[in-house]
């Protein structure tokens, strides 16, 4: 019997590096200026925040943000931050997260508040791309 990836049910793995081609397609549409959830080695934009900078504490006003946050327990805080920052003038936030429509954050900040929700067909191949993610994904545009 095939075992399921434990990351599907826990916060064991929180950092899922965005597939470059997937990001490039979104960037061609939105022209991102800020990546608030980056490491020095995987930043998708010239302007970025690392864990040391704590993107949750930074101001995103006036930016076009690509946010692929850690998928652990703090995801609620990241979704709230994305929604809150998007309300600032000249700020657009595009959020890549697991498609978990049963969560509190989905109903409080995404459903009926997002400009657009795009469910990704199939499973993204994060990181080195050798295996698909153990969860479906969605792109949320605020």
What positions do the PLM features span?
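Class I S-adenosyl-L-methionine-dependent methyltransferase catalytic core
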Residues: 1-142
């Amino acid at each position: 019997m095939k075992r399921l990836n434990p990351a599907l049910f826990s916060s064991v793995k929180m950092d899922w590096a965005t597939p470059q081609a997937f990001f490039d397609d979104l960037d061609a549409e939105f022209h991102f200026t800020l990546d608030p959830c980056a490491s020095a080695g995987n930043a998708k934009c010239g302007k970025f925040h690392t864990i040391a900078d704590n993107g949750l504490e930074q101001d995103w006003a006036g930016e076009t943000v690509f946010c692929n946050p850690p998928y652990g327990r703090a995801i609620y805080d990241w979704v709230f931050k994305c929604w809150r920052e998007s309300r600032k003038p000249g700020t657009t936030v595009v959020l890549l997260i697991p498609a978990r429509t049963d969560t509190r954050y989905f109903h409080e900040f995404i459903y009926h508040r997002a400009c657009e929700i795009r469910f990704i067909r199939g499973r993204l191949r994060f990181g080195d791309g050798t295996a698909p993610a153990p969860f479906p994904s969605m792109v949320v545009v605020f």
